[in-house]
């Protein structure tokens, strides 16, 4: 398919030409030309009338299959452009949905794409009905008013059915998530702008040699892998990539997938460090906006600057500094900003940061464990090592073990005959209250 792309930039809306061209290529289009204009939005055509005439001439000369706008078009603008150009018109979000449709493999992903597409169609169908009533016989996809009204009813019915199916998927996922939490797994969500290298990072964390494609939106299906961080068991989940100005109808349609971020213990926000700072800044802010909409900004967030193998060390350090500075300016609390190369497996800074953050989670606590019977020490130590991290051991008439332990395992340790108390900030033990929420197995 051959397309002409159109970008309109203004003081309020700055769009990346490089990103738009990458979207077009990802959707499989041969880009014949890109038409650009700097002006505020024209209410009738989005671009100005003069630029529209230029576009008409290009369409006659190049004979594309479609004209695709980098901007969001109103239904009225899309119709007016079609009437002038007599060629299929698409906007940014139709283009994204087309890519999503190509990438969706699981039943859930296909349902989410269909839901988003139907939500996008509703205002277009309503505009078609309005125009029919004004005497314009264009209709929607050649349909008359009655057929268009019936199609609108069908859309709403189908959306209801899809939402019901997605709710069932969500319930099943919640059951699995609870089982994982109860089994002591720490849940980490990989989030970030599309094509930042999240899938490559997931493979590196899980030590899997699976090729990750260098293209936009390779991940629509939720993918989870497990790995160990010392004694800690981690489940990392790759999520659908963000894009600048992600509209509410796409966020809503993909909520069951994006919910993995909301339910995670830690959010790992991946950025491509090889890009110019202006692009990193734009994508970082766009990612933060999606996290804000998901109400996930209060989660522990680690920013991973990926692809450092492609830049100089001084450049990487400067970008780390700028990320910290930008986060402070925006009032965003970050746990850490680390440099990684997922492709080369250079993850040392990330693993150190994850280890520190995991031990600060509510599901972990610092405890002093007293074992009075020497023969029970090996079994208690083995249990602690399987669900936590030993800080120090003092052997004597009583064995004293200071350790980070999953709080849900306190009851199991007590059942082995050990005494346990929480460590305060000075390293002294404090007796646990009965109502502190720890099960003793009874």
Curated annotation (Swiss-Prot):
* Subunit organization: Monomer. Associates with the 50S ribosomal subunit.
Question: InterPro entries this protein is in?
Answer: G_HFLX_dom, GTP-bd, GTP-bd_M, GTPase_HflX, GTPase_HflX_N, GTPase_HflX_N_sf, P-loop_NTPase, Small_GTP-bd
The protein's name is GTPase HflX
- Gene3D superfamilies with a match to the protein in the record: 6.10.250.2860, GTPase HflX, N-terminal domain (3.40.50.11060), P-loop containing nucleotide triphosphate hydrolases (3.40.50.300)
Where does this protein reside within or beyond the cell?
Answer: Cytoplasm
One GO cellular component term, please give it.
Answer: cytoplasm
Q: Which residues form the Hflx-type G domain?
A: 186-362
Known function: GTPase that associates with the 50S ribosomal subunit and may have a role during protein synthesis or ribosome biogenesis.
Kindly state which keywords UniProt assigns to this record, in alphabetical order.
Answer: Cytoplasm, GTP-binding, Magnesium, Metal-binding, Nucleotide-binding
Q: Which PROSITE patterns match?
A: G_HFLX (PS51705)
Gene designation per UniProt: hflX
The protein's required cofactor(s) are namely:
Mg(2+)
Report a single Gene Ontology molecular function. Answer: ribosome binding
């Amino acid at each position: 398919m051959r397309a002409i792309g159109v970008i309109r930039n203004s003081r309020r809306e700055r769009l990346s030409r490089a990103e738009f061209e990458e979207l077009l290529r990802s959707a499989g289009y041969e880009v014949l030309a890109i038409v650009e204009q700097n002006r505020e939005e024209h209410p009738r055509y989005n671009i100005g009338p003069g630029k529209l005439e230029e576009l008409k001439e290009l369409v006659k000369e190049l004979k594309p299959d479609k004209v695709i706008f980098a901007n969001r078009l109103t239904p009225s603008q899309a119709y007016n452009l079609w009437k002038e150009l007599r060629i299929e018109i698409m906007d940014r979000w139709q283009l994204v949905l087309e890519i999503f449709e190509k990438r969706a493999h699981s039943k859930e992903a296909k349902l989410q794409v269909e839901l988003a597409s139907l939500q996008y169609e509703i205002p277009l169908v309503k505009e078609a009905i309005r125009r029919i009533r004004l005497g314009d016989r264009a209709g929607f996809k050649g349909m008359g008013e009655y057929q268009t009204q019936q199609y609108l009813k069908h859309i709403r019915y189908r959306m209801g059915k899809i939402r019901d199916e997605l709710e069932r998927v969500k319930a099943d996922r919640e059951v699995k998530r609870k089982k994982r939490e109860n089994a002591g797994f720490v849940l980490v969500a990989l989030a970030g702008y599309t094509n930042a290298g999240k899938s490559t990072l997931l493979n590196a964390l899980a030590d899997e040699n699976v090729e990750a494609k260098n293209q936009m939106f390779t991940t629509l299906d939720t993918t989870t892998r497990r790995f160990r961080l010392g004694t800690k068991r981690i489940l990392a989940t790759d999520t659908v990539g963000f894009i600048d100005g992600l509209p509410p109808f796409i966020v809503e349609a993909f909520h069951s997938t994006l919910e993995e971020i909301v339910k995670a213990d830690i959010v790992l926000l991946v950025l491509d460090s090889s890009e110019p700072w202006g692009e990193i800044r734009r994508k970082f802010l766009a990612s933060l906006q999606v996290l804000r909409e998901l109400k996930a900004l209060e989660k522990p967030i680690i920013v991973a600057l990926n692809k450092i193998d492609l830049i100089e060390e001084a450049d990487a350090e400067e970008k780390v500094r700028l990320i910290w500075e930008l986060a402070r300016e925006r009032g965003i609390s970050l746990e850490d900003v680390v440099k990684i190369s997922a492709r080369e497996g250079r993850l040392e800074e990330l693993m150190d940061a994850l280890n520190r953050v995991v031990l600060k989670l509510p599901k972990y606590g610092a405890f002093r464990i007293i074992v009075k019977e020497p023969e029970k020490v090996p079994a208690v130590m083995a249990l602690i090592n399987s669900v936590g991290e030993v800080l120090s051991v003092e052997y004597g008439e009583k064995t004293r073990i200071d350790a980070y332990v999953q709080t849900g395992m306190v009851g199991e340790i007590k059942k082995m005959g050990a005494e346990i108390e929480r460590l305060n900030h000075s390293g002294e033990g404090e007796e646990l209250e009965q109502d502190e929420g720890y099960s003793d197995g009874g």
